[in-house]
């Protein structure tokens, strides 16, 4: 599933081609996604794009009369095409732009979403989200306050969008390794120093992944079709049985709620 760095990479990739250009029309080949493509998107015509923003894992296209909310789901991706190239089986949505470019949405599993709203504030998919992990609001003090009475393991708690948005499975595993914290530790057991460190390394890991264009494991390419390169720097995720890059101990893989967790028994306490 694309996580925050992959979505931010998409935002940065498509923004220069959309902002200042006009959507001539939308071509919806298959509107049966996680939720049906909103009727307003079918009717788009001669509509300028004012900005391309991101909230959590949602891409937000600002238009004069409302917003398109895009979620990539499990396997979705966006590409900028220089012209109207023939569509393939899983190419479900095109935005045809006045500058000759095409924004093409591809989603083999069709678990993404293209929604429309007049106002972002209060929209049900955005209403209950925690702070952005790269914001000043997300820091050690905030994390300690939220963890203090939480009797659940720290890894699934980090992946809860009510705590902080966009820290998915890959980056939760990588951040906990960087902080030396075992994923099964109770959130309430973290010290002030550990919360400070964890907040800092989450920011560092996410920023580094964004710089590398995200992590390409199976489905996610960048908006230009190229892979993300952070996978080459992964310390624990997807490395079951391989030696820890720090101590040489074999990386362990377990499952919690059907999600894989990777860690080093020696480095993480």
UniProtKB/Swiss-Prot annotation:
Active site as annotated: 2-3, 57, 259
Zinc finger spans (FPG-type) are 235-269
One GO biological process this protein is involved in is: base-excision repair
Q: Cite the entry's keywords alphabetically.
A: DNA damage, DNA repair, DNA-binding, Glycosidase, Hydrolase, Lyase, Metal-binding, Multifunctional enzyme, Zinc, Zinc-finger
* Catalyses which reaction(s): Hydrolysis of DNA containing ring-opened 7-methylguanine residues, releasing 2,6-diamino-4-hydroxy-5-(N-methyl)formamidopyrimidine; 2'-deoxyribonucleotide-(2'-deoxyribose 5'-phosphate)-2'-deoxyribonucleotide-DNA = a 3'-end 2'-deoxyribonucleotide-(2,3-dehydro-2,3-deoxyribose 5'-phosphate)-DNA + a 5'-end 5'-phospho-2'-deoxyribonucleoside-DNA + H(+)
Spell out the subunit comment.
Answer: Monomer.
Can you say what this protein is called? Answer: Formamidopyrimidine-DNA glycosylase
Tell me what gene encodes this: mutM
């Amino acid at each position: 599933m694309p996580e925050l760095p992959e979505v931010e990479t998409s935002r940065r990739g498509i923004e220069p081609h959309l902002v200042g250009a006009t959507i001539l029309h939308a071509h919806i080949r298959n509107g049966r996604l996680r939720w049906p493509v909103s009727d307003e998107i079918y009717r788009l015509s001669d509509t300028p794009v004012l900005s391309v923003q991101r909230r959590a894992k949602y891409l937000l296209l600002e238009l004069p009369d409302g917003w398109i909310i895009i979620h990539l789901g499990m396997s979705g991706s966006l590409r900028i095409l220089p012209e109207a190239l023939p569509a393939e089986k899983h190419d479900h949505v095109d935005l045809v732009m006045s500058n000759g470019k095409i924004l093409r949405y591809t989603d083999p599993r069709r678990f993404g979403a293209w929604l429309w709203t007049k106002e972002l504030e209060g929209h049900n998919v955005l209403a209950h989200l925690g702070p952005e992990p790269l914001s000043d609001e997300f820091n050690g003090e905030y994390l300690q306050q939220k963890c203090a009475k939480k009797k659940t393991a720290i890894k699934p708690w980090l992946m809860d969008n009510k705590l902080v948005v966009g820290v998915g499975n890959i980056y939760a595993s990588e951040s906990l390794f960087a902080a030396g914290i075992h994923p099964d530790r109770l959130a309430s057991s973290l010290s002030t120093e550990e919360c400070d460190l964890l907040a800092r390394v989450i920011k560092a890991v996410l920023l580094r992944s964004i710089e590398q264009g995200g992590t390409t494991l199976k489905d996610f390419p960048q908006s230009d079709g190229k892979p993300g390169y952070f996978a080459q720097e992964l310390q624990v995720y997807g490395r079951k049985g391989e030696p820890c890059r720090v101590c040489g101990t074999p990386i362990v893989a377990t499952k919690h709620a059907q999600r894989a967790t990777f860690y080093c028994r020696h480095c993480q306490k």
